[in-house]
């Protein structure tokens, strides 16, 4: 099989010392190459070239670094879809050092979007996820490294995890952006005698990217302007556990709510929207009101969160897995026999 693959090696995106997306994908590609498959690659933020660079050939299979981002990437994705070729998307997974792999798109267009609530019922019992949960909590292990330890204000607050300002999950799946969510949540909190605690996105810490600088300026202005808005950089689990609830657009930190068994509201259409693990409402005022009034079944949400954690741990492609297991899971998610 002739395979075209998007490769990226950008550690800052994960807030880590290396990019585990590249570590996992290059291992898979090398094994498939050993089995007789051939590769060309499109490179993103990379100087090294482990495979011949993509020109304009015809391929049997396209492994895409998400169908979003640069126009050339979107055009390539659409080209191979239109041609009836199998296309698999991948990006950072929700668990530490993992990949999300999907035969359609990501977020609210995932292959699993409409069926995930039923799929996670495979979990034998919610308690089956407890060993996984405790390991993550005790090790303070999140999708991204948790290093800072700012003091958390002794107030009642709504927690907002930072996201990339123009992230694909926001631009493509929410009518309300991060700035809009922050503004509306600050106003809502003031009306109800609450504060807002905001944790900056760890992948943007120290970044000189224009979007990162724009976001830093925005959050600094909000802290200066609103006395009930606090920027706090510490363990995301601690921030979630002490909050009244979490409010986000469509954040990868939803998995941290799942691990910490805490309620989360999303105004963007996420992978988790129909799973029973989150409250999804594109109307921010309405969603915040639902959360504050606790107009949902919290015990049911917690059980669904545990089932989801079990399912993700069982079926996500993770760096620690043997290569045969990674290929087995990749085949399951992609629908492509390798």
Language model regions located:
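Extended catalytic core of nucleotide-activated donor transferases of GT-like folds
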Residues: 22-31, 40-102
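Active-site donor-nucleotide binding/catalytic segment of nucleotide-sugar enzymes
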Residues: 5-14, 149-206, 309-314
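Short, solvent-exposed loop/turn segments at secondary-structure junctions
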Residues: 9-12, 46-49, 67-70, 93-96, ...
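Catalytic donor nucleotide-activated moiety binding site of glycosyltransferases and closely related
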Residues: 39, 43-44, 183-232
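N-terminal pre-catalytic "stem/leader" segment of glycosyltransferase-like enzymes
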Residues: 1-58, 191, 333-338
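Structural alpha-helical scaffold elements that stabilize or flank donor/cofactor-binding regions
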Residues: 55, 151, 238-242
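Leloir-type glycosyltransferase catalytic cores
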Residues: 104-152, 276-338
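A donor-sugar binding/catalytic signature common to diverse glycosyltransferases
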Residues: 61-75, 232-279
